[in-house]
Amino acid sequence: LSGEEQGLFGGKILAKYAQEHDWRVHGVLNNDMIGNSTGINGVTDNTTARIFSEGTRVIETKDQAHKRRFTGGEVDSASRNLARYIDTIADRYIENLDTMLVYRLDRFGRGGHHRPFNDVGFAAVRIMETNENYNQQHQDLRTENGITYGDTIDYVDFAYAAKLTSLNAVTMASMAWAPAPPTGVSISGAVKPSTTLAWHKSDDPTVVSYKIYWRYTSEPKWQFSRDVGK
């Protein structure tokens, strides 16, 4: 997407177009940046990556915020669950890669093209390298005081970039194989020792079963699951 550094123009245009044309978007994976493995701090690490995701949705209504106050879910936005899913895929399929869930929209004072999609209600995350080198970002090509500035191909760790590209490919393939998410989902449990989940059963013949995941509220990742059939 173009115009990122000038004001996220490409993302804004595409997100608006997708919204106006009723695109069915289940997730946006913004890869920015995935090719550098040596940070300005001198650390070289090609075994980790970060996944940034927003908490509460920016389009949340006052009524939704009121309900969330009593039911929780501050760390259960669609974007954050997408990040958890990508992390699970990394653990399952990508060797020697540990993805770290970062509970923020982006780095402090920074932005990326996933944000315009969040702004209109789509689940979107930022996948990026762990260690950044700011001498290679937003710089004119030059050498000053023995320091080389600028983003050039010499600094690309292609093996690392391939690893994160593979993560994207496997994630998208896994999501594409899945049927549509259930509709009419509700949760209840007042004056009960347990929680009741309900949803509209799908008529899709490819749906053979539903699996429920849960975790302690203090845990970042899903801990438990149960297959409940169809």
Segments and roles (model prediction):
Residues 36-52, 101-177:
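Active-site-adjacent mobile loop/cap segments within catalytic or ligand-binding domains
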Residues 182, 197-201, 212-214, 230:
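An aromatic-rich alpha-helical recognition segment common to small helix-rich domains
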Residues 209-230:
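Recognizes extended acidic, P/S/T-rich segments that occur
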